[in-house]
Amino acid sequence: MNQQLPRFIRPLLAAALVSSGLAAEAQGSGTPAPLSLQIINHGPASFHVNSVLVSGAREAILLDAGFTRADALRVAAAVLDSGKKLSTIYVSAADPDYYFGLEVLHAEFPEARIVAAAPTLKKLAAALPTKLQVWGPRLGANAPRQPVLPEALAGNSLSLEGQTLEIRGLDDSLAHRSYVWIPSIKAVVGGVNVFGNLHAWTADTQTPAERAAWLAKLDGIAALQPAVVVPGHMLPGTPQDLTAVNHTRAYLQRFEAELPKAADAAALIATMKAAYPQAGLGIALEIGAKVNKGEMKW
C-alpha cells in the first residue's frame, strides 16, 4: 500500500482529486451541477428518431422512448452506463416512434414516472389502437406487447436537481407536438418539430394552417436563441444548433410552394428530391406527398 505510484499516474490522480474536490465544493455551496445531454440516435428503420438523456449530478430525465424494443434497450443501456437514477420519462409527441419503447423502459426502470403533456396524451391514446394495427405486424418481435401509456403532466415543466425543463409549444393548433427548452444550458430538444438533414414528415400536417402552425413553432424555437438544438429526427453528424431549425423551415416553405404546382404526388416527390438531393428519410417525402395530394389516406 505504501508503494510509490508510477510517475504517469500521478498527474491523472491529482486531476481526478481536484475535479472531485471542485464538484464537492459546488455541491456544498448549493450550486447545481450543469446539466448534460446525451443523444441516442436511432437508425433509419426507426425514422432516425432521437432519444435524449438529460443528466444532472445524480439523476436524469429521458426525453422520448424510441420506436422499437431494440431502441428502448439501447436507451436503457445508456441510462445504466450513466450511473444516474432515471427519475422521469417525458414523451414529447403522439407518434409511435416517441413512445412505443415505453414498455421496455418501464420494465427496466419501474420507479421512473412516465408523463406527457395533456394534448399529447389525448392524441396518443386515441390513435394507439390504429398505430398498433399498422405497425405491430411490421415490427414483429420488436413491437410493444403490452403498451404503456404516460400519465398527464401537471403543469408545463419538469425539474431536475433544481433546474427547470420547460415544456413549450402547447398553446397552438399542434399542441400535441411539444418541444423542451432548458434555459440553464440554453438548449432546445425539438421533438417532431425539427428535422436534421432529412425530408420532413408532412403526412400529419395536411392543411396550410397546420403547416403554418409548424412554422410558427420553429420561429418560437429560434426566438429563444438556443446554443444547442437537438432535432427530433436527424442523420448522424447533424450539427446540434439552429441549422436543423433553418433546414426544416426552408423545407416546409418549399413544400408549401410546390404542393399546388405539382400535378400529382410523383411530380411533387421529384421536385422535392431535386431540391434536397442529400436528404434522408425518403419515406417521409413519399407518404407526405401522397397524403397531401389526396392520393393516400393517413
Regions found by a protein language model. Give the residues of each.
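Bacterial N-terminal signal peptides that target proteins for export
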Residues: 2-13
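N-terminal signal peptide c-region/cleavage motif recognized by signal peptidases
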Residues: 19-25
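Boundary of Sec targeting at the N-terminus
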Residues: 27-29
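Conserved beta-strand hairpin/beta-sheet module of binuclear metal-dependent hydrolase folds
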Residues: 32-81, 85, 179-192
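Metallo-beta-lactamase
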Residues: 67, 168-172, 176-246, 250, ...
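Active-site HxH/HxHxD metal-binding segment of metal-dependent hydrolases
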Residues: 81-159
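Accessory terminal helices/loops
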Residues: 123, 223-228, 235-298
